[in-house]
């Protein structure tokens, strides 16, 4: 028991980090009414600024040179030829946090203030993708280590327990309590704090009293980004710095912020510290002999924030504060697919052209785009038609990929794997069917909270679910087999005696897989068209528009949500199995939450309510038909897609496919005018 208590004490440090991030989320929500999914990235970028200043004396700005050559945009400031001390680096990082606060308010959340909730979500996700990709481009994706600013030293045998805890962890928790308590007093006693509370209660009422909502939002965003950046710097003493790791710290921070009802900075602080304590203590139970091996330590750690978020959402539900609800009826358009047969014909023509004239690289890109299109169709059903913002569709695909591979394995060593993958050796069609069914079951499990919540709150649940499921299922060697955490080889698939793939050591051409994937894409398009044009599609759109009105018309809202998630999960599962066939070796990083967010972002760029939008997003997907070959080019493309996603949220939430709407409107008007003239001539 003493070991568990010691681990709980060690969790105070990371809990302090969660607490400050959660406090930043609460402050941003009080000022703008937005739950910021970008909070972890706002801690990550100043932390990289601190590390870079310590190592090289360079200070990078959160942009890059978009037009190298004719117009040189400064993106780096060299303050010293070598690294500088901790204090100048700390001040530079805090200054960077202030810059981020100004940019976030002026360029993103300020213009989105009177936009519908879906646009705010798109903008928040765009900022997350932009900062994460930009950090990977400027600083690299490898782990960075540097001495922080907190004093060194260890408190040996605290409270008579064996072991020790760093003073840095205790100090970070203490700083979190000071920040949380100080902000609680600030919002109760200061003039700006009282004005913030007035705007928070009623934006219209506060505006009528003469308070500037924009000014109040700016002040609160500056506070939020500053304390978040400070947290990112202080946590460097015991947290490994990578773009992905820091960005995903937003998940436990969201759980702590919800503990404070998104309104109380003090309760969010307490929730963050308790969450860190519970996570660390729970990991100690996995070291016991009686603990089941199929529940890994990291999976349990990631499941705790998910459980906290689900419990809070279920108990509080619609009582959680949501601003901007008067714009909730504005949803991206989801028109009936009219020219879908033309689209299918174009897909067949492109496939034939690539089969006969394309290189092996082009064939691989076509396969990637085809699979991405199926995955994005799953999001079209759930997000575009049903109106439920799910960020876990790629996770559903990963579940199907891993479990179908395990079910098809027979104990042989496949490909370049160093491990024999044990399994029942089921035929590939049956293994695929079972893998998709399991993905549907996982999707329905994640969909249960959607019965009670929706919008950004559901996005929070699905994001936490994606993080937890990745570790519990895909990273679980007891469930998946050896190689789950590194490289898991896929058994060569055979369908009715036909080899779907070819050994890469023999040939890079994969004509059979191209035909196989295109057939599945055509089937999925046909299914989605049938859903949209049928009774099910009308029910989905009714639920998306107004759940209460749909219920009054006899629509089973809960059943419609579960059905939508089931269909979307099935489509995602198909995409996952096809990805396994293509890659032949599965890596857990392919299916993480950030990759899933990137997939959804490309769909938003194309048009989330359109089948054609899924096709546009699939063309833009990494390693797709319109991708670049260099890794640097891929990162820059992802960064640009994040910036473009923000622009889409502000100016055109229907996506790039809606750019043709004015042309279609003019053509329709021209045809109507011509028809009218012909009618008049006939009458004469």
Report residues per predicted region.
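Short, strongly hydrophobic alpha-helical membrane anchors
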Residues: 1-5, 69-76
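N-terminal transmembrane alpha-helices
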Residues: 4-18, 22-23, 40
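Non-cytoplasmic
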Residues: 24-35, 229-245, 258, 573-588
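Glycine-rich phosphate-binding loops of nucleotide-dependent enzymes
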Residues: 34-37, 202
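Alpha-helical membrane-interface segments at transmembrane helix boundaries
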Residues: 5-13, 109, 131, 162, ...
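Hydrophobic alpha-helical bundles that form the membrane domains of multi-pass transporters
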Residues: 182-239, 243-244, 248-250, 257-260, ...
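Transmembrane alpha-helices and adjacent helix-loop boundaries
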Residues: 17, 40-43, 47, 63-66, ...
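Transmembrane alpha-helix interface/packing and boundary motifs in multi-pass membrane proteins
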Residues: 25-35, 239, 255-264, 378-388, ...
